[in-house]
């Protein structure tokens, strides 16, 4: 059985109320039509506290980008600053889950699939 990362957390991203904050490393400034999709969920993964990755996905599995951070705390702080009040509470990915990326997409889909009905 493969070992799991020490830290695996997800947080849903609600509707953005302000201007979208994005940092592009190439072709800046980028045409908004060419930007990656706005995510419905973020996944934070870290093997140790030396570095952490944040991955962004839509509820339909579209990749919305990723960022490398120096630590879990920095990843959380920068992600919370990026999405402000739109970022909901962080929740741990259950230990028994093997694929945290698939879990994140499924988690978002199950919680957001009926949002247009409200």
Residue ranges and their predicted role:
Residues 1, 55, 76-78:
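Intrinsically disordered, low-complexity boundary segments flanking structured domains
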Residues 10, 14, 41-42, 110:
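Intrinsic-disorder/low-complexity peptide segments enriched for small residues
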Residues 36-64:
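Short aromatic-glycine-(Arg/Gly/Cys) micro-motifs in beta-strand/loop hairpins
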Residues 18-21, 61-65:
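Short, surface-exposed beta-strand/loop "edge" segments at domain boundaries and coil↔beta transitions
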Residues 64-118:
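Mixed-charge, Lys/Arg-enriched low-complexity segments
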Residues 1-35, 115:
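Negatively charged, low-complexity tracts enriched in Asp/Glu with abundant Ser/Thr
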């Amino acid at each position: 059985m493969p070992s799991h990362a020490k830290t695996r957390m997800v947080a849903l991203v609600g509707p953005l109320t302000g201007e979208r904050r994005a940092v592009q490393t190439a072709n800046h400034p980028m045409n908004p039509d060419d930007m990656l999709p706005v995510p419905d969920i973020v996944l934070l993964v870290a093997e140790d506290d030396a570095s952490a990755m944040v991955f962004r996905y839509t509820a339909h599995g579209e990749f919305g980008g990723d960022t490398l951070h120096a630590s879990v705390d920095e990843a959380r702080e920068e992600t919370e600053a990026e999405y402000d009040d739109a970022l909901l509470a962080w929740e741990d990915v259950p230990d028994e889950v093997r694929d945290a990326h698939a879990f994140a997409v499924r988690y978002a889909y199950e919680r957001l699939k009926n949002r247009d009905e409200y």
